[in-house]
Amino acid sequence: MSKRLKILLTNDDGISAKGMSLLVSNLLKADFADLYVVAPSTEQSGKSMSFSYTQPVSIESVDYPQEVAGAWAVSGSPVDCVKLALGDLFYDSFPDLVLSGINHGSNAGRNIFYSGTAGAAMEAILSGVPSIAFSQEQHISFFQTDSAPELLRKLSFYALSNPFPVVTGFNVNFPASERNEPWKGMRLVATGKEFACGLPKLLSSDGKRKSFSLSDCQVVMDEDISEECRCLLDNYITVVPLLVRNSPLALTSESEFQQLQETFQEFMCSEADTRLFDV
């Protein structure tokens, strides 16, 4: 019998978020790992890789409504959660994998650079732990649970298979089907440039002072639509590799990427139930 994995779960929507509950419940159904939740006590969306540099941050053991091995709430950002988990809670025995999400809303395209969900995954990678960030387009209610346990299991073991000679992770986005159609499958793609968030919306102005909201999102597309965006529009789950080399996000060469796409398909087809996934 293979050993059970030790997985750290975090997010940026907060420890009580529906997306975290969905991630936990589907991992429990897959039953291949012991789960530890270390997540912000309040919503921390848009925090990217920020951490509490100028003020103290606290961590508190909490009761979680699902059967996890342990749960802690952190008074800080998603990166704070990963730093405290790896630097304190699991200092002597790192988790095998860090899973972040499931985010309420897309983190495809440009959103990845602002995302606290992706920021937590990147922090784990920088610390030497493979990681995956999960996000659901539009609204968390679009998340489909029928095939999710097997999908999460396969992606977890793929991240642990060392597809690159460096510690790696993935940014996974689930499409939103207005007609609730089943996901068509998975596609490993490069990061697109669509889906910009943070557009200024004027709330009030008194002549001297203006007040804005930066929570508006607008899909920005060129005529040359990215493969990531096209796949999501076609109801495919997108899997984008995150690599740490000399910069926070480093893309491979075209030939390396094509090779990665081939190995991704081979790995997923090696055990995957083709009735569930078209990879």
Swiss-Prot record:
Coarse class of the protein's main subcellular location: cytoplasm
Cofactor(s) the protein requires to work: a divalent metal cation
Residues reported to bind a divalent metal cation: 12-13, 45, 103
Pfam families (alphabetical): SurE
Subcellular localization, as worded in the UniProt entry: Cytoplasm
Protein's UniProt keywords contain Disulfide bond: no
Keywords assigned: Cytoplasm, Hydrolase, Metal-binding, Nucleotide-binding
Molecular function GO terms recorded: 3'-nucleotidase activity; 5'-nucleotidase activity; exopolyphosphatase activity; metal ion binding; nucleotide binding
Family under the similarity heading: Belongs to the SurE nucleotidase family.
Entry protein name: 5'-nucleotidase SurE 1
Source organism of this protein record: Chlamydia caviae (strain ATCC VR-813 / DSM 19441 / 03DC25 / GPIC)
